[in-house]
Amino acid sequence: MRAMKLKIALFVTLLAVPTLTAQTQVVRIHAATILDGTGKTLKNATVVVQGSKITSIETGSPANVSYELGQLTIVPGLIDVHAHVGWHFDKNGRYANRPGTPAQEILYSAENAYTTLMAGFTTIQSPGQANDVELREGIARGVFPGPRILTSIRQINERSGTADEIRQKVRQLKTDGADVIKIFASASIRDGGKQTMTDEQLNAVCGEANAQGMRTMVHAHSPESIKASVNAGCQQIEHGVFATDDVLKLMADKGVYFDPNVGVVLQNYLKNRDKYNGIGNYNDEGFAYMEKGLGLNKTMIQKAVNTPKLMMVLGTDAVAGAHGHNADEIVERVRQGGQKPMDAIISATSLAAKSMRLEKQIGTLAAGYEADLVGLEGDPLTDITAVTRVAFVMKGGKVYKFTDGTARAK
């Protein structure tokens, strides 16, 4: 036990890279270009920060600039609305589908959280892991560095009971501190993606969540499961590999957020096939479904991008092997789907924040917002891959990443 405590202490110490502690003095960050997260572009501008908040954005480069980012592009801290921060490979390099000790699991989660933060993601939403609450609170207290975390803690699916039992589970999740309710309305893509929850169950879970003032995010691949979830009053649909024009339009008409995952998760599974194969439904049939899903996703994202008023938010479904590659989702939505680069950035900033009901706190660079800033090497409006080249990360007024050679501190 003492050895484990020493390991934990050492790990946290190593993770705690030197940061600029959020203080009361004014910090000024200047760059050639600033994208504010709402569609506006500012040239030769400075973000002024005091404590954890942005106090103003000024034109020009003041003499007393604290961080000169030169030709970097500043964007708001990126947001991933669907990341499995606790998923990891075990010591043998295989997917750890059975949890280890609590100490081991929190260390893996902390490592993934740190990796995600270094990739420019300052807020993520985790759809349910046993230690999510501890991780969320530890990061919030500054025990170790990581993105701001929202979590569903657990999930609700077709095995969660009767309508009344499901309503009770929703109330319990609220009591336990869940930020969102995660629902499985369909099977996995590896099992064909058909609807699994009944309409009655979906009406119960989304109805109770709405009554409790809680958000819902729904795993739904098939058109039937998407339609049933939207009609039940759910707020956000995940995946949607088999989404048709009709259900895409339904989501747009009902103001439901859509989080298609086309650039990270399936690619990661196929890249790491040997690490997953033979575990549960990670078998030959399952991988065949996922290979087919790549083409289906391309067709789907093209339709989604061209659906008027559809609110697409940025989520990756990042699992073991994918942490730190979250921005690839932004790149592939532009490449495969034809999404405009500015729209893709908005989906990962202000719109993602709105989907979390945090639109007045994060996702936008403006006075009064949390000082979450990311510096990118290049201009993502002309080269979307710039979102994968992160040289500067500030979260809540603290600098966690500052790459020498691309910018300088004064």
Describe the residue ranges of each PLM region.
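Hydrophobic h-region of N-terminal signal peptides that target proteins for export
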Residues: 13-21
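Histidine-rich, glycine-flanked metal-binding segment
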Residues: 34, 38-75
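Metal-associated gating/positioning segment near the N- to mid-region
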Residues: 72-141, 200, 224, 229-232
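Active-site mouth loops of central-metabolism enzymes
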Residues: 94-107, 152-168, 194, 215
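Short, acidic/polar
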Residues: 105-113, 161-173, 221-225
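Divalent metal-dependent hydrolysis catalytic cores, especially in the metallo-beta-lactamase
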Residues: 108-132, 146-156, 178-189, 215, ...
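Active-site core of metal-dependent hydrolases
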Residues: 159, 184, 190-295, 318-320, ...
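His/Asp/Glu-enriched, well-ordered alpha-helical/loop segment
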Residues: 211, 282, 293-380
